Amino acid sequence: MSTFLLTWIIMTVALSVTLFLMPQQTNAARAFFVFGDSLVDSGNNNYLVTTARADSPPYGIDYPTGRPTGRFSNGLNLPDIISEQIGSEPTLPILSPELTGEKLLIGANFASAGIGILNDTGVQFLNILRIGRQFELFQEYQERVSEIIGSDKTQQLVNGALVLMTLGGNDFVNNYFFPISTRRRQSSLGEFSQLLISEYKKILTSLYELGARRVMVTGTGPLGCVPAELASSGSVNGECAPEAQQAAAIFNPLLVQMLQGLNREIGSDVFIGANAFNTNADFINNPQRFGFVTSKVACCGQGAYNGQGVCTPLSTLCSDRNAYAFWDPFHPTEKATRLIVQQIMTGSVEYMNPMNLSTIMALDSRI
């Protein structure tokens, strides 16, 4: 055998072994499913007859395409950045006609701006995907995937997936605190919060029954500190609206208790609590520390704190989005969202309970 041929055989075998041992990122990457409201909607409302939409400029001004996508952000949103951090492609909206074939195996985004825990939250936005409908679409998704890879592998894909659930803020902002609110006349803030937690537990139990086994559940941020609440409460010096802050202070601890109780009932840490209040409060309370000029005024909007109405092509628009913690009256900029994801990935129990996402990924990789 010639030296050349022997060398060629050795190199070929070595390359084959190397390729065999290399992690197969595309096949091994876990699916990612997203449920919730405008904080995580990646464009489903574009396909609906609704007033809750972000499909016109200047939304998306800093997105890679420079165009609005339906994300309530100047650029990437929370699911995008989580996907980026875990080495996965961004999930497509479940209503997108592009979500077909192998793209289904990456996961899907079911979120819809305007929805809440309660079905009467967001009625002013007309046609939105309420959480029950999101779950129906999740069932239909699983049927579609089963046609591609079979039912057993579909169950494995869903069981092994990472799931993000973001609900609750709209139930306060666009229901309880909404002008002429029936809910507010019927119950105290504490009673309403208890109702939300009771209904949320039913929602998360249904999600578990649909196959979810790793679910990150975000609480509400500092509701009284968003520009919309500063404007509507008549804040003079940027003080957060006290009643909305009280709502978050009541709701979030109840949510943690409920998640811990659910995990005990199941016998496993299925539900991971992400403390959205703390992750947001860090840069809201000390914006300069994180490179922001302001955490009170929205980049895009009008009126006091740019917090009145919604962001439109006619709104006042800041020139440097990285100097602002809030993009519009309700939603953070991409830069602020990256700070939130940083704590989701590596934060202490002050931010993630009982563990952060990096720890989850490391533990699950050993299974």
Swiss-Prot record:
It comes from the Eukaryota. GO terms for molecular function: hydrolase activity, acting on ester bonds. Its main location: secreted. Residues 1-28 form the signal peptide. The active site is at 38 (nucleophile), 328, 331. GO terms for cellular component: extracellular region. This is GDSL esterase/lipase At4g28780.
